Amino acid sequence: ERKCPIDGKKVPSCIRYKTCSIMSGFGGAGAFSDGKYNITNDFGGDLYAHIGKENAIELMEYVDRVNVDYGGAGTKLYSTEGTRFSKLCLQNGLHLLQAKVRHLGTDINYVVLENLYAELKDKADFYFHSPVKNIRTEKGGYVVVTEKEEFFCKQCVVSVGRSGSKWMEQVC
């Protein structure tokens, strides 16, 4: 069984082990997950705190449509709303968090990510294993500062995933 060697002491950060894409690269940990996508503000993050609950749900539903369009068409969307289990929880004084969940499964999730990358690779520049120190606005665009160089762009999509979420909170 593979295990990430980062322990915080001897190995403080990613050593970019060649066969390991557990937390980074296109899809990051999601490339090896079971492909469950939650559509809810009740758990899983606080995007709604920045853009409002309705906008957050709209974005999650957009991501769901993209997942379906890029290979997840035969998968099911589950919901806790109005279920027998939801009623049973209420009868017993429990509050069931409301969510819709698209379960792609590991294999289909990987196909979706492959299809997305194939669609985007010629339309955008991807930089993997390029730790970003800072991002600043400048001359109607953005300057992305890495350990080795600086990049200027008119539009910038920062996709840090779980492994970079704490850093992203500091930058924003």
For each predicted feature, which ranges?
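Predominantly flavin-linked oxidoreductase catalytic cores and closely associated redox partners
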Residues: 107-171
